[in-house]
A protein has these predicted regions:
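Beta-rich, aromatic/charged-enriched effector core domains that present basic-aromatic interfaces
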Residues: 1-69
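Gly/Thr-rich phosphate-binding loop signature of adenosyl cofactor/nucleotide-binding cores
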Residues: 75-78, 82-144
Length: 144
């Protein structure tokens, strides 16, 4: 793939930046806003399927807030890249009750159902300039 490399060596001088990804979330940091998605023609059907197939799973579909089209999935990806990616690495392993997602992308469900593919993510991230190396490396490694 020839990413995370510079002249055959790891970008940033090391293969993993995990030690830099364990910062505690400061008390005065703004909680990133998780985008609200409008219901589409698919949303009602998706909720019915989830309730029928997974009746005993945790959670409710009343607050279903995920993209249901490729266009909105790519929009969610673009929002993550522009608003959250740079801080992702610093707080990648942090847990704090003020937000369930913080700087995470929440793209896994969209990958799992095929609304986006890893190449969509990686190609867009590679175009973004001035990303902190620990965010870049940590996120790309998760996608790969």
């Amino acid at each position: 793939m020839n990413i995370l490399l510079e002249n055959g060596k790891p970008k940033g001088g090391k293969w993993s930046h995990d030690k830099e990804n364990r910062k505690k979330i400061p008390k005065n940091i703004d909680v990133p806003i998780f985008r609200n998605f409008k219901d589409t023609t698919h949303t009602k059907d998706i909720k019915k399927i989830i309730n029928r197939v997974f009746p005993d799973n945790y959670g409710e579909t009343d607050d279903f807030n995920y993209p249901t089209t490729r266009k909105t999935a790519l929009g969610m990806l673009d929002q993550f890249i522009s608003e959250k990616l740079n801080e992702f690495g610093d707080y990648e392993d942090s847990v704090d009750g003020r937000s369930p997602f913080w700087f995470h992308s929440v793209l896994s469900p969209l990958l799992n159902i095929g609304l986006i593919i890893p190449d969509d993510i990686i190609s867009r991230v590679l175009k973004k300039k001035n990303i902190k190396i620990n965010s870049y490396e940590g996120f790309i490694r998760q996608i790969i």
